[in-house]
Amino acid sequence: MAAKIRREDEVIILAGKDKGSRGKVSQVLPTGKLIVEGFNLVKKHQKPNPQLGVAGGVIEKEAPMQASNVAIFNQATGKADRVGFRFEDGKKVRFFKSNSELVK
């Protein structure tokens, strides 16, 4: 099945501590999760590794979130939207369900 949300899509977070925020998808994982730039930050205790030049300490990094907790953002309506698929000129394209415009 084709992915409804892909890398570089702008999404709205629907659930969790960052609910209502908009961000860009930086990575889509095969487990049904994705990473949104700057959101779902967790603190990781990093052990120093002098061989790699990595300093130790507490760092913040983006953690994956379930794809069902985000919705694609429709620029035309300014709201979260659903995505459908259709064929145009022999190619499968994504479109917004609310106004039938193509995604990107």
UniProtKB/Swiss-Prot annotation:
- What does the record give under GO molecular function? rRNA binding; structural constituent of ribosome
| Family annotation (Gene3D superfamilies) | 2.30.30.30
- GO annotation terms (biological process): translation
- Report the domain of life of the source organism: Bacteria
Coiled-coil region(s): none
Annotated keywords: Ribonucleoprotein, Ribosomal protein, RNA-binding, rRNA-binding
Note whether Lyase occurs among the keywords: no
The UniProt entry's GO CC annotations, sorted and at most eight, read: ribonucleoprotein complex; ribosome
Give the family, as the similarity comment puts it.
Belongs to the universal ribosomal protein uL24 family.
Which HAMAP family does the record associate with it? Ribosomal_uL24_B
**Self-association state and partner proteins as the record states:** Part of the 50S ribosomal subunit.
Its biological purpose is as follows:
One of two assembly initiator proteins, it binds directly to the 5'-end of the 23S rRNA, where it nucleates assembly of the 50S subunit.
This chain's protein is named: Large ribosomal subunit protein uL24
Originating species: Shewanella frigidimarina (strain NCIMB 400)
